[in-house]
Regions:
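Conserved Rossmann-fold NAD(P)-dependent oxidoreductase catalytic core, especially the SDR/UDP-sugar
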Residues: 118, 122-127, 133-141, 145-173
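N-terminal Rossmann/SDR dinucleotide-binding element
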Residues: 2-122, 126, 136, 157-160
Length: 173
């Protein structure tokens, strides 16, 4: 069952770190290269923001994947050197791992996590199928239906966030 393709177009104004301070951001693709870099940048340069990190739980669970796959990344080396144990405290208070999947209705979120989406001010969508030899149906499901499902789910909570869409290599002709 494919999600309805209602046109949802959001063009946010350019945002500076000060604009994002105190805001709640929903970040997808956080276990990927770019998503990890975005999370590090948010923690380093945007004080006071809260990041809801949508993570496919896999066999480890979302929280464990955040700690073992994302926070252990070399991308966090300089920030870890600067903050030491304070980084773990910052992650514990500012990053909320949400066990979810863009391929599932309601993103597969628990009722508690779905309710958290009502407070989202900004979505940064960096999850994508980026393999150049992916089957077309896999690429469409991830890169087209996933973002539509994401926006529909967030908007179903009453939130009307700004959206930053990170595109794949295939968007330009």
């Amino acid at each position: 069952h494919r999600p309805a393709m209602n046109p949802i177009v959001v063009i946010p104004a350019r945002m500076a770190a000060s604009d994002l301070s105190g805001r709640t951001l929903l970040l997808t693709g956080v276990t990927g290269f770019l998503g990890t870099a975005i999370l590090e940048k948010l923690l380093r340069d945007v004080p006071g923001c809260t990041v809801l990190a949508l993570i496919r739980p896999g066999r480890l669970g979302a929280e464990r994947r955040l700690r073992q796959e994302v926070m252990a990344s070399d991308a966090f080396g300089p920030l870890r050197d600067r903050l030491g144990a304070e980084l773990d405290a910052a992650v514990g208070t500012r990053v909320v791992p949400l066990a979810g999947d863009l391929g599932r209705d309601g993103l597969g979120l628990s009722g508690t996590d779905l309710a958290r989406l009502a407070g989202v001010d900004v979505i940064i969508h960096s999850a994508a199928e980026v393999a150049f030899d992916s089957a077309l149906d896999v690429a469409l499901r991830t890169n087209l239906e996933g973002p539509v499902r994401l926006l529909q789910t967030v908007r179903s909570t009453g939130a009307m966030p700004a959206v930053v869409q990170v595109s794949t290599a295939y968007v330009s002709g």
